């Protein structure tokens, strides 16, 4: 699998506008991984997707993949509640933006995330299939995704259930790799790989691993040096 032409064209145009970030020229391991990054009010997704050279599949809310659902989300929340636009402006704006965003998400091969729904199993299944096919997955688990703070606050832990599902399917464990777009140095940095302990129950270490990922991302936020990977 690879990015679609529409996404690649839009990305190439955007690269002419946005400041360039230096990305790693090698992968942290020879197998597919789950990259965990900091959202920072779209700063993280924009720069990682713009400047990271290799294919990876982003977790994104399911509403952004379907045009009608995307339109409803922009009209009922983003433009009216978050940006306080009046409906007569929000509706035509949402119509145009929803077509652009949904097509871009489809072309980028975004994995739909179904929050607060039993359909989340579809997200896990598609993610595991992606990893088994040799492609990596990219997740931005910030609870307060609208925060502009360079440091990571609380993160959702649900995405770590990928470990349990993947292990059940393959007998192997996932490498969770922190990935951070650093504004001050215009670099994309790897952190230390986080792995679950095969000799401990998953549920006993899920909270611990979430905190380790959060701490490693914040270490990257406050350092100028990329670490060695293990």
Report the location of each language-model feature.
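Short glycine- and acidic-rich boundary segments immediately preceding or forming the N-terminal edge
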Residues: 1-3
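A short, well-structured juxtamembrane/interface segment
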Residues: 5-32
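Structured helix-beta-strand junction loops
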Residues: 16, 107-108, 133-134
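A generic local structural motif
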Residues: 19-24, 44-45, 124-125
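Flexible, charged surface loops at secondary-structure boundaries
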Residues: 26-31, 52, 130-133
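Catalytic core of membrane glycerolipid acyltransferases/transacylases, capturing the structured
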Residues: 31-115
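Non-catalytic C-terminal accessory region of glycerolipid acyltransferases
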Residues: 115-230
């Amino acid at each position: 699998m690879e990015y679609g032409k529409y996404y690649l064209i839009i990305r190439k145009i955007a690269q002419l506008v946005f400041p360039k970030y230096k990305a790693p020229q090698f992968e942290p391991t020879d197998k597919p991984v789950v990259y965990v990054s900091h959202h920072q009010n779209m700063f993280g997704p924009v720069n990682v997707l713009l400047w990271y050279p290799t294919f990876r599949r982003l977790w994104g809310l399911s509403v952004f993949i379907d045009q009608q659902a995307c339109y409803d989300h922009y009209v009922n929340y983003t433009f009216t509640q978050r940006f306080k636009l009046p409906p007569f402006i929000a509706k035509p704006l949402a119509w145009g933006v929803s077509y652009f965003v949904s097509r871009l998400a489809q072309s980028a091969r975004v994995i739909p995330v179904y929050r607060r729904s039993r359909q989340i199993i579809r997200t896990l299944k598609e993610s595991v299939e992606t990893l088994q096919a040799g492609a990596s997955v990219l997740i931005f688990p910030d609870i307060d995704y609208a925060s502009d703070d360079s440091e990571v606050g609380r993160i959702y832990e649900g995405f770590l259930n990928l470990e349990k599902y993947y292990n059940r399917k393959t007998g192997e464990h996932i490498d969770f790799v922190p990935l951070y777009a650093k504004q001050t140095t215009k670099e994309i940095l790897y952190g230390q790989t986080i792995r679950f302990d095969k000799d401990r129950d998953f549920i006993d270490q899920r909270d611990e691993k979430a905190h380790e990922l959060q701490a490693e991302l914040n270490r990257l936020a406050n350092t100028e040096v990329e670490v060695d990977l293990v």
